[in-house]
Amino acid sequence: MNIVITCAGKSNRFKKEGINIPKFLLPLGESTVISNILDTYDDNDNFHLVITNKQLDQNPNLKSYLNDLKKNIYLNIIKDHNLGPTYSAIQAKTCESKKDIIISYCDFLIDWDYKKFK
């Protein structure tokens, strides 16, 4: 399965409250939001994360952190934009398959039975 996760948002509301890291990097339990999202899927899935060059500039260790989360992480680095998560998902050029794709946001968690879904 190919999992496209759009992480390219600007987190404007969080920044207004003084939180200056991307939402997907916020701590959640003993980990981060993105780590918890990835854990809802199978380790053998392909994870296509879409992030911006601006996020990389502001978080120098971001690339290595994301690559260390799972073995099949594919980063799609795009320019900062205001076009929304659908635009970001379309930019996941590492996802060449036209089938078996799940598109997920990076800032919500769901409790579901992924094995039943597959």
Language model segments and positions:
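Conserved N-terminal catalytic core of the sugar/cofactor nucleotidyltransferase
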Residues: 2-5, 13-15, 27, 31-103, ...
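The conserved beta1-alpha1 loop
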Residues: 8
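Short alpha-helical oligomerization interface
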Residues: 19-24
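Conserved donor-nucleotide/metal-binding helix-loop-beta segment in metal-dependent transferases, i.e.
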Residues: 113-118
